[in-house]
């Protein structure tokens, strides 16, 4: 992660969002110009080697998100490169957020990095590059067309390859991986899963379905199906009503799949 670039990225996103709402959609309520976004620290940056180093990585990434203006934040756990995290690892991730929120003072000021020459330079540069991307996507016919053409997937794939190549070639330092390795790296204690969890959860789900009002469930699904076939209909009220009537996420997803089909990603090499 490039720390300052990460902060600038969020600031640029806020600028672009406000600009689009004002200039393209002519939104008049200034509150609608505010970009509200959630940040999750990077799973890609977590290493299987020297897992305690990941605590530092997560803390820096979380701080970048906060300085960039996020409204909510998830901090990954140090051992997620290896398995589902242990309770201790999750607690450290939580404490990381709490220390940032309560001990650093960064939450007392709106846009604390604003005015920094370097941050403002990066923010403007990222904004310009993003606008180029948006125009490029627009020429393709929009985001959906770009997905169908495999544009986003290819961009991610190319970037991932370039990053891996830089690490393998030693051009990008990853502490504990291609530099500052430890021949006696301590094997972390990993989470062990109780395989009976699946059986117990299936039983809970069956009991849940037995005790709900089947008439309301069927009615909610039928209304959702009808709404989904009308491209001008807002589906959110129907989804909320279905949830209130105890329709499961799986059933809602199955309803949409029946109408829209299942997305098959374009494979390219």
Task: Cite the ranges covered by each PLM segment.
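Append "with occasional cross-activation on large, charged helical scaffolds in nucleic-acid assemblies
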Residues: 31, 46-48, 71, 144, ...
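Short secondary-structure boundary/capping segments
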Residues: 10-14, 52-55, 88-92, 259
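Structured alpha-helical segments in the cores of large, soluble enzyme domains
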Residues: 13-14, 18-28, 56-69, 92-104
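Short beta-alpha connecting loops at secondary-structure transitions
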Residues: 1-5, 39-52, 58, 73-88, ...
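A general structural signal for short secondary-structure junctions and capping/turn motifs
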Residues: 27-29, 64-66, 136, 165-168
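Active-site-adjacent bridging/hinge elements
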Residues: 34-36, 69-72
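Flexible, glycine-rich loop/tail regions that form catalytic "lids" or insertion modules at the edges
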Residues: 86-87, 95-98, 102-269
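Gly/Pro-rich turn-and-neighbor structural signature
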Residues: 1-53, 135
